[in-house]
Structure formats: structure tokens, C-alpha cells
């Protein structure tokens, strides 16, 4: 396989994002829409899997994350929606100027499609682990742990550091304050930002989305069980949504959870299914 290209994406508001292009022959591109606080390197093995089958893949670190973060997150001014409307949009634009684009999303990636300036530029999207985020959809005791994160650990951590120190709570990368505030507010609502009158500027765009979307969740995903997925994807009223329930035993693993979709244990069976689903909408697999 061709060596990945480390590139810089320029957003519409002038921010510079670290990104990686896994090159393949031809003009087919998959853009990976990362989960909240997850650096692009986490998706490397899936990107290499698709690249080996003749598909270009683009991954990026959103602003404030991974190689796109400033020297300090304290005082870093941004909103959660910037990751979708500006950062993911820059990755899609990069791919769209070079060929046809499909999207593979993880968690936030399912929320981001409807926030893109023009989601209909995508041929189709397959997203994993995207749900409404409300703790009430989660099984016990996860709902109590998440409630404690928002109402106890989060407020203490943000007061101490000026950002959300997720890494100190075993939860991945630290999050900018603007991301924490928006995420906390929307996760308090059963249908996420669709229940927030102040988010109307975001949610109104979802009705414009008319692409096919595969919305896959594992039945053991504590953060995005099927009911949570269904609550959120009602917002894509004019898209063709294919709700896909995955069983860990069907993938030959004991656990998938919220992060296992892009780990190689489950990926051995899941990734071919993902590309096969996208193939219904024009993606062609070839040996790179």
C-alpha cells in the first residue's frame, strides 16, 4: 500500500487541521467522521483496510483534538458544532475536489452529517454508535455513571482546568470548554439537540439531507443502544435511514461496546459489511 500522506486542511474560518490521506488509485474517497475527542489515529486500521481495497480515505483531527489542538485548551474559543460545520466540512471539501465521497462516521459522526453545508454531496454514509446521548436511554448502571460525569466530575474538572479534563477521568482526550458545555446541554435532552430550541439553526438543516444512511449500533453499546439511535435518527426526516442492529456474537467477539466498531477484533467481520453496504450506493472495491 502507498504510504499515507500527512496533509493540512484549511477550514472556512482559517483554522489549520492535521489530517491524513490514505491514497489509492482512482477517485473514490471515504471521509471518516470521528467521535467526540477521538484522534484520527484510532481509525488508522480501518483506513488501511479500505485503502487496500482501492478506496482513498481521509481522516482528520478536529480543532482542539490530537495534532490540531493548541498549546493549551484553557481559553480556547470554539463551539461543538464547529467540528461538523467547519472541520468535517473541510475534509469533505478536500475529498470532493478529487472525486466521489462516501462517509463513515463514529458517534458524533452521525450527528455531523446533518450539519454539513451540503450533506447531499455525499453518495451515502455509514455510521456506527450514533445516538441521542441522553443518559435515560442507557442501561443501568451506565446511566448513573454518565449522570455523575455531567453533574459531578465535569463541573469540578472544568472549574479546576478551564476545559473538560477527560483524560484524567479515563475518558479519552481533553475537551475544549465550548464542546463540554454544548455536549452536556444536549445530552440532558431525550432527542439531543432536536429538543433544544436554541439549536434550531442546526436542526433545521437536517430536513435537507436526502442521502442513504446506514445507522449501525451494537446491542452492547451502552452509550448508543438501539433506542437511542432511533430517537436521534428521527431527525433525518427526508433521508433513507437503514437501522442496523449488530450482535457481538455475530461478529465473533465478546464485546463491541461504543469503541469496538473500529478495533480489529470486531472489524474483521464488520468492516467488510460496512464497505458492502456502501457498495449498494456506488462504492467499488478493487485491489489497490
Give residue ranges: language-model regions.
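N-terminal cap/lid segment of alpha/beta-hydrolase-fold proteins
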Residues: 1-22
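Active-site glycine-rich loops that stabilize anionic/oxyanionic intermediates
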Residues: 27, 32-38
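Conserved alpha/beta-hydrolase
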Residues: 40-73
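Alpha/beta-hydrolase active-site loop
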Residues: 77-96
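Alpha/beta-hydrolase-fold enzymes
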Residues: 104-191
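Short beta-strand/loop motif that positions the catalytic acidic residue
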Residues: 209, 215-217
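Short alpha-helix in the alpha/beta-hydrolase fold that links the catalytic acid
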Residues: 224-235
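Catalytic active-site module of serine/aspartate enzymes centered on a nucleophile-bearing elbow/loop
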Residues: 242-288
Amino acid at each position: 500500500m502507498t504510504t499515507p500522506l500527512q496533509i493540512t486542511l484549511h477550514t472556512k474560518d482559517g483554522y489549520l487541521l492535521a489530517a491524513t490521506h490514505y491514497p489509492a488509485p482512482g477517485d473514490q474517497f471515504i471521509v471518516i467522521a470521528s467521535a467526540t475527542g477521538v484522534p484520527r489515529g484510532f481509525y488508522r486500521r480501518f483506513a488501511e483496510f479500505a485503502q487496500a481495497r482501492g478506496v482513498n480515505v481521509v481522516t482528520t483531527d478536529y480543532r482542539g483534538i490530537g495534532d490540531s489542538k493548541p498549546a493549551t485548551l484553557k481559553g480556547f474559543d470554539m463551539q461543538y458544532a464547529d467540528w461538523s460545520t467547519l472541520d468535517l466540512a473541510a475534509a469533505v471539501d478536500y475529498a470532493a475536489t478529487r472525486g466521489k465521497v462516501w462517509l463513515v462516521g463514529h458517534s458524533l459522526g452521525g450527528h455531523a452529517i446533518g450539519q454539513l453545508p451540503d450533506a447531499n454531496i455525499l453518495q451515502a454514509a455509514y455510521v456506527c454508535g450514533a445516538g441521542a446521548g441522553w443518559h435515560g436511554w442507557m442501561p443501568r448502571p451506565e446511566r448513573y455513571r454518565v449522570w455523575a460525569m455531567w453533574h459531578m466530575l465535569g463541573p469540578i474538572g472544568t472549574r479546576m482546568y478551564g476545559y473538560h479534563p477527560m483524560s484524567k477521568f479515563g475518558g479519552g482526550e481533553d475537551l475544549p470548554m465550548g464542546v463540554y458545555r454544548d455536549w452536556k446541554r444536549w445530552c440532558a435532552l431525550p432527542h439531543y439537540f432536536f429538543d433544544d430550541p436554541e439549536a434550531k439553526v442546526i436542526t433545521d438543516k437536517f430536513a435537507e439531507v436526502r442521502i442513504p444512511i446506514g445507522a449501525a449500533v451494537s446491542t452492547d453499546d451502552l452509550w448508543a443502544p438501539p433506542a437511542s439511535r432511533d430517537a436521534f435518527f428521527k431527525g433525518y426526516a427526508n433521508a433513507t435511514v437503514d437501522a442496523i442492529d449488530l450482535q457481538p456474537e455475530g461478529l465473533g467477539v465478546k464485546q463491541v461496546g461504543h469503541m469496538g466498531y473500529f478495533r480489529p477484533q470486531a472489524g474483521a467481520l464488520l468492516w467488510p459489511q460496512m464497505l458492502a453496504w456502501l457498495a449498494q450506493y456506488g462504492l467499488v472495491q478493487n485491489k489497490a
